[in-house]
Amino acid sequence: MTRPFAASEYDAHGTAIGETRPVPFATRPVLQGTHGMVAAGHYLSAAIGQRVLEQGGNAVDAGIAAGFALTVLKPQSNGIGGEVPILIHLARERRSVAINGQGWAPAAATIDWFTSHGVRLIPSDGLLPAMVPAQFASWCTALLQFGTASLADVLGPAIELAESGFPMYTALRNGILKVAERFKAEWPTSGAIYLPLAADGEVIRNPDWARTMKAVLDAGLRESSREAAIRASLDYFYRGPVAEQALAFSSSRAFPDATGDAHRGLHSLEDWAEYGASGTRVEEPVSATYRGVTVQKCGPWSQGPVLLQQLKLLEGFDLAALGHNTAEYLHVYLECAKLAFADRERYYGDPAFASVPLERLLSDEYAAERRRLIDQEQACNELRPGSIAPEAVGTAAWPVVTGDTTHVDAVDRWGNLFAATPSGGWIGSSPVVEGLGFPLGTRGQMFSLDPEHPNALAPRKRPRTTLSPSLA
């Protein structure tokens, strides 16, 4: 059998270096370049990011432009009302940063409020689980601190997409189809944009989104500097008409959700204004070394360290000897994943509110201790977090509203790297805010109402998220 080759073992023409045997059959070429590259969840998004690179922008500029485009192109997967954790590697400075792009809970969102209203589990739909939208502030923070382009350069193409339209495609059509009856019966503001359902290839538009974000952009046009213009647009979104319109919508109407009752949102203008001013955090990424490669993830407010824990556990096994994707290989992989996710459930949460023992969780000693729990002959069906007694695996009482997530990666000619995972604020879980063209997110569903849990609900706290971009 022909030996598989790593990408580094091929020359610029795709020929294996030092190898005379046939190259393994492939139907697509290896994509290579010297100017930069963008990969994204939709081809038009990737093209927009690539155009920014060609115009002289860096990886951050390109990634943000692609990210804004994804909010228009993939509303079934993410939206400007959602969140986006970001990882950036700065080649010249030889350092990486993480942007905590997760919105926080409103001041009124307390465990007492939910329990006193008979809510025992935060629903996955409607207005009740809405956090303050984080996406726009996260993109702007990345652009301000690490980008070079203007907000018009990176937001303009998305506005053009929303205004002029783009072809309907199967995944979006299916996403709308799943909730079309709800659009008709409960969420007419969503139906006004996405119904009647377009056929594949038919051009669809979101003029409300285009008007909203053009007004956001115009708020900074009179400013004398790039930085001042971005900040003026941030204020317009979080302190001005966008926030006011979203709050008027969420406070004046109650929408049915998975609890069986109808609820309004819990936001206030202060929640939005404070988040817009100081809510987005730039942090050090969490990292671990796996077989000589440094892998970087966002902190324990995300799912990032779970992968690092898995890698620490896997490092103790001879995976090559097990054979790629054999039953033995997959068994070891899955058992390591179970142990890492059990620790996530027990320990992870917003580090501003919970003490997360990351140093211990990512230590070699802890990995060796946990690795001994793995039986290579039998699967374990218990939740086994470290240092506490095993628990039976349970399930949530409410059905989870399924959405999706998308992603964008960018690299530029200077060696800068950008990875972001925008999610939430999708059209399947919450009604579109009238006049704005996008729904609010529902990430509050991730909170626990157990006050002793590290991910317990609290005002101004970020829910633990599953989103997890990576750099290596």
Describe each region flagged by the PLM.
Residues S287, H407-V408, S470:
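Short, surface-exposed charged micro-motifs
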Residues Q309:
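Protein kinase glycine-rich loop
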Residues T141-T148, E160, S164, D218, ...:
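Short, well-ordered loop/turn and helix-capping segments at boundaries between secondary-structure elements
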Residues P305:
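Flexible, polar/acidic helix-loop-strand segments at domain edges
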Residues T15-G18, N206, A243, L247, ...:
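Internal maturation/activation junctions in enzymes
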Residues V72-A98, R253-E270, V411-A472:
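Active-site rim segments in enzyme catalytic domains, especially the processed small/beta chain
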Residues T2-A47, R51, G57-A232, F237-V295, ...:
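Noncatalytic scaffold domains of N-terminal-nucleophile
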Residues R281-V282, T402-T405, T465-L467:
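Short, small/polar residue-rich loop motifs at catalytic or cofactor-binding pockets
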